[in-house]
Swiss-Prot record:
This is 3-isopropylmalate dehydratase small subunit. CDD domains: IPMI_Swivel. The lineage of its organism: Bacteria, Pseudomonadati, Pseudomonadota, Gammaproteobacteria, Chromatiales. It comes from Nitrosococcus oceani (strain ATCC 19707 / BCRC 17464 / JCM 30415 / NCIMB 11848 / C-107). It catalyses: (2R,3S)-3-isopropylmalate = (2S)-2-isopropylmalate. One of its GO terms (molecular function) is 3-isopropylmalate dehydratase activity.
Length: 214
């Protein structure tokens, strides 16, 4: 998992509340568990004018010109601005995989669905909760300003606007540590590889029958 400390980037505003995981990545794309390759199908039913299927080359599909991610001014955005209850609906880690695979490192919203919120941290995506008034202000500024960018400082827990306004956010210290170090659950476990190895060696001495081959 790529470490995340400071993110500076273009913001894209998705002005919809209750965006569920089926909208983020439709169910027909859930067969793969590789974590990669989902980016082109992010928001598939909103992004394209035809019906998407696994294996379909998205480069030749008709784009929906009204969908915000397709607008030229937002190309290359790595910060998604959203509304309340982002990531609700069925539990699918693929929703986070699709966002990360499409280049997003941060999602800012007034609230997130609990499971999506947890999955985001496990996959290197920073979900930032700001109060509704602050989010509404960011929507107005993003839509009014071409190339609107934000600076996200995870160590300082701050969002800074181009005008220099600082918006603090809170985050669990353990999750913050994992994001900054680029540690998923496997990486976190491997930090203790020496202790695990020592325990296994000790168990072989204390309880050798557990290791006997039948």
């Amino acid at each position: 998992m790529e470490p995340l400390t400071v993110v500076e980037g273009l913001v894209v505003p998705l002005d919809r509340a209750n965006v569920d995981t089926d909208a983020i990545i439709p169910k027909q794309f859930l067969k793969s568990i590789k974590r990669t390759g989902f980016g082109p199908n992010l928001f598939d039913e909103w992004r394209y004018l035809d019906h998407g299927e696994p294996g379909k080359d998205c480069r030749h599909r008709p784009l929906n010109p009204e969908f915000v991610l397709n607008q030229p001014r937002y190309q290359g955005a790595n910060i998604l601005l959203a509304r309340d209850n982002f990531g609700c609906g069925s539990s699918r880690e693929h929703a986070v995989w699709a966002l990360v695979d499409d280049g997003f490192r941060v999602v800012i919203a007034p609230s997130f669905a609990d499971i999506f919120h947890s999955n985001a941290f496990k996959n290197g995506l920073l979900p930032i909760i700001l109060d509704e008034d602050s989010v509404t202000t960011l929507f107005k500024d993003t839509e009014a300003t071409l190339g609107y960018r934000l600076r996200i400082d995870l160590p300082a827990q701050e969002v800074t606007t181009p005008e220099g306004k600082v918006m603090p956010f809170t985050i669990d210290e353990f999750r913050k540590h994992c994001l900054m170090e680029g540690l998923d659950e496997i990486g976190l476990t491997l930090q203790y590889r020496d202790e695990i190895r020592a325990y296994e060696e000790r168990r072989q001495v204390e309880a050798p029958w557990l290791f006997e081959k039948g």
